[in-house]
């Protein structure tokens, strides 16, 4: 008889504490009490973000001949959002608990119930307990709540100056489709990619940096001939899933979620989410990225509303068509969170007293690690320190390198392990004699003696693709 297994505990809270303690992520406005809906990225967090963006851009744009980049405005003409359907349909069902007077998305409550019990609630919201008190729920009737964040341009806050902060980067791509096709001399199949901030008036932000009102997206719109869309859709689902595993995510912690037909967005014929097993309370899986077949909806609606022809004329086949669009849309900070959670580990390391200590280590892929190497003089010494600083300065020409001379060497190793630094380089008293240093690898803790003039080449060999 198989023994029942206890579900592994979520590492999200542990990782969140580490992120705050080591300067990856800070609560926004912490000196004023902070807010659940926004976070600031510290010195290490911004490096990790940039590394993720760099790997995405390399994978999606610079390594391909059929994709180019774009950086469109955050505030687009209001007509864009009216044409796209966002003003009319970008709403969520909002309910309020009559017990705590807190507001929730009704669809999230229903989905959480179904995930926990394996079936939808027989009596709808009436069967759902209050998330905060656990009491049988008493809810208001659902009402629609706009996810668009409004702003006003010009001297007067009136209807004429009403604009929206973009809820997605995609529309900036669609309205530039013709510009890019013409100036970059592209023809379907080809893609336009961009990375940028988007804003959504989320009812219930939370789960650390997972759901926020201001967030960063990595999106690409791939324009294809109608009839070839299903084949390209599957290609991008497979390609995007492989990107996460190539950067170190355990395949066991990833899954594909097919949106039911009745829950598809108004523009989509098929959407598949790439989800990560975060093990949130009440929801085991969380979406990292959606890959949607948006059909010809976007170019068609913008063509109709703007009066601009957004079709493509295929000279080889003497036919004109409006391209279909395949959209891989990833959340940058959700990816960052998944990489951190998946990389977090605890193991044992020898200490100075001959025993072992529990060490925390982020086993991040070297391409993502915020700091690539740390230079550590064995002690603060008039001979060692200048040599170590010179080495760090030389290596900084190529990589993000830390210099740390504070505390016992074992403690300094631990500090680098828990931020994911792949290599620690120790300058010791033997260095003064043999002109060599000790390089320690993060995961195995194995050490090698390398000549000073070979250190740069050693790191270059082990940090390919960063």
From Swiss-Prot:
CC terms in the record's Gene Ontology section: cytoplasm
EC class name: ligase
GO molecular function: ATP binding; glycine-tRNA ligase activity; protein dimerization activity
Binding site for ATP: 200-202, 210-215, 287-288, 331-334
GO BP annotation list: glycyl-tRNA aminoacylation
InterPro entries: aa-tRNA-synt_IIb (IPR002314), aa-tRNA-synth_II (IPR006195), aa-tRNA-synth_II/BPL/LPL (IPR045864), Anticodon-bd (IPR004154), Anticodon-bd_dom_sf (IPR036621), Gly-tRNA_synthase/POLG2 (IPR027031), Gly_tRNA_ligase_bac (IPR022961), GlyRS-like_core (IPR033731)
Reactions the enzyme catalyzes: tRNA(Gly) + glycine + ATP = glycyl-tRNA(Gly) + AMP + diphosphate
Places the protein is found: Cytoplasm
PROSITE patterns: AA_TRNA_LIGASE_II
Binding site residues for substrate: 105, 168, 215-219, 327-331
EC numbers for this chain: 6.1.1.14
Family matches, as SUPFAM superfamilies: Class II aaRS ABD-related, Class II aaRS and biotin synthetases
Keywords of this entry: Aminoacyl-tRNA synthetase, ATP-binding, Cytoplasm, Ligase, Nucleotide-binding, Protein biosynthesis
Function, in words: Catalyzes the attachment of glycine to tRNA(Gly).
Quaternary structure and partners: Homodimer.
Family in the record: Belongs to the class-II aminoacyl-tRNA synthetase family.
Name this protein carries in UniProt: Glycine--tRNA ligase
Taxonomic placement: Bacteria, Bacillati, Actinomycetota, Actinomycetes, Mycobacteriales
């Amino acid at each position: 008889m198989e023994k029942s297994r206890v579900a592994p505990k979520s590492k999200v809270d542990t990782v969140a504490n580490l992120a705050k303690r080591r300067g990856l992520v800070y609560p926004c406005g912490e000196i004023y009490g902070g807010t659940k809906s926004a976070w600031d990225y510290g010195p290490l967090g911004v490096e990790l973000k940039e590394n993720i963006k760099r790997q995405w851009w390399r994978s999606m744009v610079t390594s391909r001949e059929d994709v180019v980049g774009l950086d469109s405005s955050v505030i687009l003409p209001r007509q864009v959002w009216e044409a796209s359907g966002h003003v009319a349909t970008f709403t969520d069902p909002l309910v309020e608990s009559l017990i705590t007077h807190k507001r929730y998305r009704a669809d999230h409550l229903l989905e959480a119930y179904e995930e926990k019990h394996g079936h939808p609630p027989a009596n709808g919201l009436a069967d759902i307990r209050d998330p905060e008190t656990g009491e049988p729920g008493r809810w208001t009737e659902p009402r629609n709540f706009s996810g668009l964040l409004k702003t006003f341009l010009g001297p007067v806050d009136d209807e004429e100056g009403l604009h929206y902060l973009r809820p997605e980067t995609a529309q900036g791509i669609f309205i530039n489709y013709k510009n890019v096709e013409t100036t970059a001399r592209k023809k379907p199949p080809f893609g336009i990619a961009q990375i940028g901030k988007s804003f959504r008036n989320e009812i219930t932000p939370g789960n650390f940096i997972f759901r926020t009102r201001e967030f960063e997206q990595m999106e690409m719109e791939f324009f294809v001939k109608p009839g070839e869309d299903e084949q390209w859709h599957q290609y991008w689902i497979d390609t995007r899933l492989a990107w996460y595993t190539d950067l170190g995510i355990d395949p066991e912690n990833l899954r594909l979620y097919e949106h039911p037909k009745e829950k598809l967005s108004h523009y989509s014929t098929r959407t598949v989410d790439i989800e990560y097993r975060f093990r949130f309370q009440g929801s085991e899986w969380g979406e990292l990225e959606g890959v949607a077949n948006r059909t010809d909806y976007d170019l068609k609606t913008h063509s109709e509303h703007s009066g601009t022809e957004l079709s493509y004329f295929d000279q080889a086949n003497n036919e004109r068509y409006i391209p279909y669009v395949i959209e891989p849309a990833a959340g940058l900070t959700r990816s960052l969170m998944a990489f951190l959670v998946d990389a977090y580990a605890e193991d044992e390391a020898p200490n100075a007293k001959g025993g072992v200590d529990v060490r925390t280590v982020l086993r991040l892929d070297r391409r993502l690690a915020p700091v690539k190497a740390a230079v550590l003089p064995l002690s603060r010494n008039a001979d060692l320190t200048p040599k170590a600083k010179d080495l760090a300065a030389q290596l900084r020409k190529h990589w993000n390198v830390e210099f740390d001379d504070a505390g016992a060497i074992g403690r300094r190793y631990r500090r680098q392990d828990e931020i994911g630094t792949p290599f620690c380089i120790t300058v010791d008293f033997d260095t003064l004699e043999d002109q060599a240093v000790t390089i320690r690898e993060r995961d195995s803790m194995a050490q090698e003696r390398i000549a000073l003039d070979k250190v740069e080449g050693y790191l270059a060999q082990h940090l390919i693709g960063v």
